Regions:
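N-terminal, charge-rich interaction modules
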Residues: 1-29
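Conserved acidic residues
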Residues: 14, 47-48
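C-terminal substrate-binding/active-site "lid" region of AdoMet-derived donor-dependent transferases
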Residues: 80-120
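Short, glycine-rich nucleotide/cofactor-binding loops
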Residues: 50-60
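Short acidic low-complexity segments
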Residues: 36-47
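Mid-chain, well-packed structural core segment of small domains
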Residues: 61-93
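Core SAM-dependent methyltransferase catalytic element
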Residues: 121-130
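Mature catalytic domains of secreted/periplasmic carbohydrate-active enzymes
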Residues: 32-33
Length: 130
């Protein structure tokens, strides 16, 4: 069975950015060896891989404003949010959400991945790399 980070295409990365990591993911992060993990935008210049956890649309809007300048053009960008079916977490992000904060920066959703019963992630790529 593939690990979370194999599913997220964490291949050949030497450094990654993980923002707003919720409880329950520290063990999976600890499994990553020989990879520098940054958990603050202050620590980074331009990243090739980012996994950002947000709970609602407002958090996403605020985070993308500061995150976008820190991403390389062909970044592997995943935005994780609570699943609508989660029994523990609430969110206003649904399948009908238009992802406007990302689309205005020319990021398009390309894949959806169930992380666990409470979280799912959407991968985005810049339109010019599709």
């Amino acid at each position: 069975m593939k690990t979370l980070f194999e599913k997220l295409k964490l291949e050949n990365q030497k450094e990654i950015l993980i923002l707003n990591e919720p409880d329950g993911f520290a063990e999976q992060l600890a499994e990553l060896v020989d990879i520098e993990i940054y958990q603050s935008l202050i620590q980074v210049n331009k990243m090739e891989f980012a996994l950002v956890f947000v709970s609602n649309i407002k958090e996403l809007e605020n985070q993308i404003h500061t995150l976008h300048p820190k991403l390389k053009d062909d970044v592997v960008l995943w935005v994780a949010h609570p699943r609508k079916k989660s029994e523990k977490l609430q969110t206003d992000i649904t399948n009908a959400y238009d992802w406007h904060p990302l689309i205005k920066h020319r990021y398009e959703p390309v894949k959806v991945l169930k992380i666990n019963p409470d979280w799912e992630a959407v991968r985005f790529r810049r339109a010019e790399y599709l």
